[in-house]
Amino acid sequence: MAVPDKIVSELASWMKDQKLVAPQMKDATAFYRNLEEALDVRRSTQSMNTRGQNTWKDGSAIDFCSNDLLSLGRTGELRTEFLSELAKYPDFALYSGGSRVLGGNYDYIEKVEQEIADFLGAETALMFDSGFNGNVAIYTSIPRPGDAIVYDELVHLSTHTGMAASLAATKVAFRHNDIDAFREAMISVMESQPMIQDGSRSILVSVESVYSMDGDVCPLVEMLEIAREICPKKNFAFITDEAHATGIIGPKGVGLVKHLGLEKEIAVRLNTSGKALACTGSVVLGSATVRNAMLNFAGSVTNTTAPSFPSVAVVRSAYNLLRTGATQKAQDNIQHLVRYFFKSVSSHTLWDQANDMGLLSIPIIEESKDRDFVTHIVPIWTRQKYNWWLFFHLQLAKIAVVPINYPQVPKGKARLRIMIHATNTESEVDYLVSMIYGFVKEMMDIEESGEKGKIPKAAQKIYALMAANA
């Protein structure tokens, strides 16, 4: 199979960007040399981020990596709805004119916020230009002095950024999705903080509905039960990041919280627009008190220009598609395709042997068995030293996936992440499965041969390309 030039050129560009730079900068000023030395730490593990072009938008590769989960961008549905929305307001302003509290507020944004709040079962909504800034706003405005934050160890970087600048001095992580570890963390905080014991301060619990690197789902119901037990004075509040649940989970994509009927139990929700909704921004859902706290204490509200009319209009357009049921078929197809992948990959004749040899593992299959839904995120594990080789194998097979490495995940936890979309097909899934097992079979043959130093063909091609670009 011929590999498109774009894939080869992108791989070559990526490899070039991983070359160490600092050793050639001895005559540079300390400012630039120190920056390059820091970047070389990333380059040394092939984890240097670059501005590489994607290979799926033009059809060079099959998209199993993008965030266009409902395929609203690819199909043009969102564009059509957006242009229709703009046509209703021919005199719209391009510029909001200031922050939400300094002249930049306007009727349309308030109307859209309330529509979203009503749709998702919240009292209020407050819009942000990104999910990252929404999370930072939450943690820099909501925790009060004396409060404590108990958080899942795998929460987003934006949550950590916000927590680091929060007024909560006590922050305790618990082992990912482990309700026993969560109980221990809650008890530890309760026993060590007198003001929380007497009910005058609160424990804020930070979790995500769906975890972006593992694809698993937060046990929200069980965690709420534990929190009620540990905090009889009800001085706890859950903050739930719904970035990967919005548009995917629940009827009409309302997210995990509303799907479980927990709208009244969760104090703060972050619902982003940059994943399934195929646009940008986020909304923070909560009570009027929560909204007022952010309007007064969050710098990313008070010191940032309010979202413009077009950016609000495209978010409204996306939620219109959800609310009217226009995306339900896409949602259902994601559920079908993920289950189809699970069945196809786990029924392969090499599945058990590959698992036993550590060549292939997909823990999310087992984790999903007891739920009435699956998520679109499917991490694929192989041996750590083979992770890049599997990535090369799939890239050269014209399959676009994402290699997840340190520092995105802890050292020794590298994996490939597959994202399944509404417009993927069964035949594309079949091809993906066949290519995964093509790699597995090749590695089995290499190991059986006992030939030292032998590497798979895709890796040979990539390393030859690296040498040619040295």
Curated annotation (Swiss-Prot):
Which residues does UniProt call coiled coil?
Answer: none
Q: In which pathway does it act?
A: Secondary metabolite biosynthesis
Q: Name one GO biological process term.
A: biotin biosynthetic process
Q: Which UniProt keywords apply?
A: Aminotransferase, Pyridoxal phosphate, Transferase
User: Which gene name does the record give?
Assistant: sphA
Query: Could you give the subunit structure recorded for this chain?
Result: Homodimer.
Tell me what this protein is called.
Aminoacyl transferase sphA
N6-(pyridoxal phosphate)lysine modification, residue list: K275
Amino acids binding pyridoxal 5'-phosphate: S212, H244, T272
Q: Tell me its cofactors.
A: pyridoxal 5'-phosphate
- What family classification does the UniProt entry report for this protein? Belongs to the class-II pyridoxal-phosphate-dependent aminotransferase family. BioF subfamily.
Upper taxonomic lineage: Eukaryota, Fungi, Dikarya, Ascomycota, Pezizomycotina
Q: What organism is recorded for this protein?
A: Byssochlamys spectabilis
Signal peptide per UniProt: none
Give the Enzyme Commission number. Answer: 2.3.1.-
